[in-house]
């Protein structure tokens, strides 16, 4: 069975910092966060494609810091997503999100679990504090370690996102970040080149 993501963009919503490399509105092609109606339309519109192709999909909230968005809005989106994973488990087999390491705590993980979240990707980008500071990330490598531990302990599929070529980055820093990602025992890694 093939697996894919149905990406739902919440461009820059929930982000507390403007990182040196980021303009989610340009990257995603979306200028406003998705509404519940738009989410329903996206998921409804993909059902036949998924059935016909025999593909399963995770509903993926990307392009912002999902766990830092307005709590009521987040729960409304999760309610819609859970309705589809419950009603169409052969097509929608999970919910995933990306977020910042400093926006993870036990309370938010409990909420995500109760609404059927299955996977969390942390936008770590680097495990070097000098690189993180130079790129205005607003979190530290220790925040990544702490959030990673909490996510793993809570039983989610756990992914890390790495960016190569950031300001102040070096080949050795990238190698060190990769080694630390391995040590954190993540299930997946996304590696992005920095393009400005």
Residue ranges and their predicted role:
Residues 37-50:
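Short microdomains enriched in Cys/His and/or Lys/Arg
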């Amino acid at each position: 069975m093939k697996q894919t993501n149905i990406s739902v963009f919440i461009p820059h919503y929930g982000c507390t910092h403007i990182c040196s490399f980021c303009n989610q509105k340009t990257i995603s092609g979306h200028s406003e966060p998705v509404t519940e109606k738009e989410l329903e339309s996206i998921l409804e519109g993909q059902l036949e494609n998924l059935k016909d192709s025999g593909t399963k999909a995770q509903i993926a909230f990307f392009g912002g810091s999902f766990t830092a968005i307005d709590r009521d809005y987040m729960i409304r989106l999760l309610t819609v997503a859970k309705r589809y994973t419950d009603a169409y488990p052969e097509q929608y087999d999970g919910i995933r999100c990306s977020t910042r390491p400093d926006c993870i705590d036990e309370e938010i993980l409990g909420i995500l679990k109760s609404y059927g979240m299955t996977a969390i990707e942390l936008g770590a980008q680097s495990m070097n504090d000098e690189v993180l500071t130079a790129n205005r990330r607003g979190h530290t490598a220790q925040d990544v370690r702490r959030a990673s531990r909490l996510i793993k302990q809570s039983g989610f599929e756990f992914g890390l996102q790495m960016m190569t070529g950031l300001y102040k980055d070096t080949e050795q820093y990238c190698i060190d970040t990769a080694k630390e990602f391995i040590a954190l025992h993540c299930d997946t890694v996304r590696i992005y080149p920095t393009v400005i």
